[in-house]
Regions:
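A detector of single, family-specific signature residues
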Residues: 1-326
């Protein structure tokens, strides 16, 4: 059934007020925005927060609709934030870039492993540099089938690389002139948070004011799991719930706080674009996060576990900068 038919049915009735709810999923938020613009209250329920009896294993559209209606009537629906068209478009661009990153990694593996099977190894320094690319272009094989396979793999690598660079340029242009620009500039005061990372966090989280410094870690799945009963308390690894894209960006940025704190040209350039208040807060965050890394290393803490803790605190600093009142 199309959205227009649904709207005609709702507006054609005699009920003064309608409440509409549906589960978040692959259908996106177009229906919710359409209904809200028409004056109909609509909520998009978070599937992970829907309460369902443990013995209820029959899942049909009719039963799901009744279950959602019952929870809506009781006020037990946990709604997700509905992004604007511009916010959703920015998020799609960020995720397209992430997909391209995965495609590029796959293409590089195919090229390197094809050469390795032939006993060809590059010893000229770091891989995937300009010098390495020139070396890859010189590889030739006597067997026609092998040469065609290598050419196809190398062409796929170049295509993925070109697509990634094109998306990087488009994201940087959008980050410099959009509704996300103020947040991107403030987040850029942190080590490891480049323009691409800052824009990705801004697009994925959207409205930072709905979170707090205490809740953003749980929202991104960076807090520990807990199994408690009475006086017994057992904690495990991080929950890894919530937005996996933003969590990956923070985890990668957290590693940058481990080396000695020496601001480089790129970081200083991002500082110059931000306000003095954001710069001061970013410098305080950088110093504290590096100090925590030093303590973790002194205790010989597992680096992966330590990085998760740094990412959790980094999320709090990002929230602090994003909601900073300048």
């Amino acid at each position: 059934m199309s959205v227009g038919i649904v709207l005609a049915v709702l507006l054609g009735g005699r009920v003064e007020r309608y409440l509409v709810v549906y589960e978040a999923g692959p259908t996106g938020f177009g229906l919710a925005r359409y209904l809200i613009d028409a004056g109909i209250e609509c909520a998009v329920a978070a599937p992970s927060k829907l309460q369902r009896p443990s013995g209820d294993r029959v899942k049909t559209d009719a039963r799901d609709a009744r279950h959602l209606a019952r929870l809506l009537h009781l006020g037990e629906i946990v709604a997700v934030a509905i992004p604007t068209v511009e916010q959703e478009a920015a998020r799609d661009m960020v995720r397209a870039r992430e997909d391209c990153r995965g495609d590029l990694m796959t293409a590089r593996h195919r090229v390197s492993k094809l050469l390795l099977r032939q006993g060809i190894v590059y010893y000229g320094g770091r891989a995937w540099t300009g010098k390495h690319e020139l070396w890859l272009r010189t590889q030739r094989f006597d067997t026609p089938g092998l040469q065609q396979a290598y050419d196809a793999a190398f062409d796929a690598l170049l295509t993925a690389l070109d697509r990634r660079d094109r998306l990087d340029r488009e994201i940087e242009a959008l980050a410099a002139n959009s509704i996300f620009t103020p947040v991107v500039r403030r987040l850029g005061c942190l080590r490891g948070v480049s323009t691409l990372t800052a824009f990705g966090l801004a697009a994925e989280i959207g409205d930072w004011t709905r979170l707090s410094g205490r809740s953003i870690g749980a929202y991104l799945g960076l807090v520990r799991t807990e199994y408690s009963s009475g006086s017994t308390r057992v904690q495990g690894g991080v929950t890894k719930t919530g937005n996996s894209h933003a969590r990956r960006l923070l985890a990668e940025a957290a590693w940058h706080h481990r080396p000695r704190y020496r601001p480089g040209q790129d970081l200083r350039r991002r500082w110059d674009a931000a306000s003095p208040a954001a710069r001061a807060r970013g410098q305080a965050a950088n110093a504290r996060l590096h100090a925590r890394w030093v303590r973790f290393d002194a205790r010989k803490k597992c680096p992966v576990v330590a990085n998760a803790a740094i990412a959790r605190e980094l999320a709090g600093w990002c929230w602090s900068l994003a909601v900073l009142d300048e």
